[in-house]
Amino acid sequence: KSDGLPTGAVSGFCSMLFKLLEDARSDDSKNKPTHFAVIFDSARKNFRNEIYTDYKANRAEAPDDLAPQFEYIRKSVEAFNLPSVELLNYEADDLIATYAKKITEAGARVTVVSSDKDLMQLVSNKVRLFDPMKSKVIGEKEVIEKFGVKPDQVIDVQSLAGDSSDNIPGVPGIGVKTAAELINKYKTLENLLNKATEIPQNKRRETLLLNKDKAMISKQLVTLKNDVPL
């Protein structure tokens, strides 16, 4: 703008939203959207910081040219006449998980528009993701390609592998590939940890035994709450 206010993020957001709405109007498939909502994070800190104080502590503040645009992104949602939702002490992903549960229990399908891999745990025969940057639908097949396990096991893989971008510790030395191998064999994180003494590889066995608490804390951090009081 002429007054120096950056508008790149607002413009990009509005363009994406406009395209989604236009595509929805022309969609004649069984997945044609009937309801829209935009969900925001309400603050940097939430209940996960009470579980693990270093959660997302490595995240830098929003760049100076981005921070002032958040207000206008919210106003643009109003201009599109769409509802927006945010709730103190919860992340947007928790609200998405809660709405997805409520909607599917009511018998409808859900499309979550996001490229966030953390939402892949929600994928089911009634919930799919849509990555607007790649125009790609993400279902069970794509989740398996990404994590090596089915959607309902993604949480356990993330609990082991951790996530440096969110400062989630996981188990040191275990990445996504190894985590997927372990979860495919032992089915759940809890079963793996209970049977860790049976693991033949000495280093892996000792690492798991020494870091059980980190794995379980990580599970609390990566698990999206689907019972948020909306």
Could you describe each region identified by the protein language model?
Residues 1-113, 117-137, 214-217, 223-230:
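Noncatalytic, basic helical substrate-engagement surface that gates or grips nucleic-acid strands
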Residues 26-37, 80-82, 105, 124-126, ...:
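Non-catalytic nucleic-acid-binding/docking modules located in mid-to-C-terminal regions
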